[in-house]
Amino acid sequence: MTTPRSLADDLRARDDAALQALVRRRPDLALPTPGDLGQLAGRSVTSASTARALDHLTRFGLQVLEAAVVCEEPFTLPQVRALFPDTAQADVDAQFDDLVLLALVWGEPDAWRPTIAARETVGRFPAGLGPTLAVVGGGTPADLVAALDEAPAEVREVVEALTWNNPTGRVRNADRVVTPETAKTPIEWLLAREVLRPLDKGTVVLPREVALHLRGGRLHRTVTTEPPAPDLHHHDPVVVDRLATGTADEVVRHVGTLLERWGVAPPAVLRSGGLGVRELRSAATLLDVDEPIAALVIELTKA
């Protein structure tokens, strides 16, 4: 089997059933009908289409996608599983397969990659993690972990505040030179040992490897594979029937008012057979309702 070099190659290797499943889950990709699989791949990586696909993911689906973004490319499925140590492997695998089906992740078992659009849509700090040491520079993960093991309690409090949420903090002169001997504050202690790294003159960041160590290797504090139970409210059937009757009476009155007015002064009709915006607004004013409600009354009157 040829290794796919792009998402387009990945799609070309899929069978008809897989492509049909992709279009069913992401129907915007088929409107208008793409000329070829290259065009389908191009549409699937647009920001708008990717954001729409993410909107339909479950919370767990988003968490697994964040894991795919966090892993260094190319990555393998076991690397994703490792970020969910307390979650059943079968659940992670099933959700990952769904991301592949949706063309949010592509590749092959030994070399998976999230699409660039998926990475950008997830955001700069996936799962609240900062950039890697390869990006921000600094010591090795082992050196930083060893430094944290010797950190005073007040220093640990600062690091823990950046562990699960926003990995950045605002600090004046964040890029100043500090040594272990000259450090006077918890922030300076961390800067001197490169546990925190400057992003710019006023911002420090906790490197990804440090945060993952403090999280115990977990990407998320809590993981729920099942969708949340809907918040259902009980309504008295008598009250529901009373409201429905009142609404029906109101609709009948609106239809009568519309027929009475249009029987005397028929509205102008477009060449296509519909009503123009001006006529819709006039009907809404006549009925003293919003335009969507006026449009519904007009449709009911026509029917």
Predicted regions and their residues:
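Short, amphipathic alpha-helical interface elements at domain boundaries
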Residues: M1-A303
